[in-house]
A protein has these predicted regions:
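N-terminal catalytic cores of peptidoglycan-degrading enzymes
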Residues: 2-150
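Solvent-exposed, acidic/flexible segments
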Residues: 94, 122, 153, 168-176
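Basic/polar, cationic surfaces and motifs that engage anionic cell-wall
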Residues: 17, 24-26, 32, 39-72, ...
Length: 235
């Protein structure tokens, strides 16, 4: 009877030892798991912090910064006006969201006439480019600076004034072709597309460029031609 009792006591002790070992292993497993989780969390936290500190080095270059390095094509006559009044303040664009088309509103005046007008001290208006009656193109303001042509949108747009032979505001063939070429080139350099080409009218409601306001179909044709030219540039 005594031996039987001892047997049960020993078996009970063995069970306790087994349970104790299992509990010990479980505690160790939980401890190791928690420790690993803490290490992983610390690693990613420090990695995120390091990335945050280095982020400026990977910041994408803005369209404005890119334009500072753009070389203007040889078919553009660069005649920058001097800094004065509001015509050219030297203020940089905040962004480039649109290319804005205007018409000069003075029939038969040339690109040179309009550029020289912008350059006068008393003049408070200007545009980045003027497209002339013979298809000539004059640049008046650097691409990355504000011009004074599109009201509140001067801060984030590039403006093009276009000459016309008569009061209808319709551009002749040479002028039109140069306008398409210039607009497509600007879109290609800024990463925009034909849908980003707008009229002065679309900003303020002013009838400018007159012919494209009065003939919506011709405006759409123009954007279509720009799209085709842009596609050719990308080939």
């Amino acid at each position: 009877m005594s031996s039987k009792k001892e047997f049960y006591i020993k078996r009970k002790r063995r069970r306790r030892k087994i349970v104790f070992r299992r509990i010990t292993k479980l505690v160790l497993f939980i401890g190791i798991t928690v420790g690993l989780m803490f290490l992983i969390k610390s690693f990613f936290k420090s990695g995120a912090s390091e990335y945050k500190e280095r982020k400026p080095f990977f910041k994408s270059v803005s369209r404005v910064e890119k334009l500072k390095k753009v070389s203007v094509p040889e078919w553009v006559d660069v005649q920058l006006i001097h800094r004065h009044s509001t015509a050219r303040t030297g203020t940089e664009l905040s962004d480039i969201k649109n290319i804005v088309i205007h018409y000069v509103g003075n029939p038969k005046t040339t690109a040179q006439n309009n550029r020289d007008f912008f350059d006068k001290d008393a003049t408070k208006v200007s545009s980045h480019f003027v497209v002339g009656l013979n298809g000539e193109i004059i640049q008046c303001v650097p691409l990355y600076e504000k011009s004074a042509a599109s009201n509140e949108r001067n801060k984030d747009s590039i403006s093009i004034e276009v000459c016309h032979p008569d009061a209808s505001g319709k551009f002749n063939t040479e002028t039109y072709n140069s306008l398409v070429k210039l607009t497509a080139w600007l879109l290609n350099e800024t990463g925009l597309n034909e849908e980003n080409v707008i009229r002065h009218y679309d900003i303020t409601g002013k009838l400018c460029p007159l012919y494209f306001v009065e003939h919506e179909d011709k405006w759409n044709d123009f954007k279509s031609d720009v799209k085709t030219e842009l596609s050719n540039l990308k080939k």
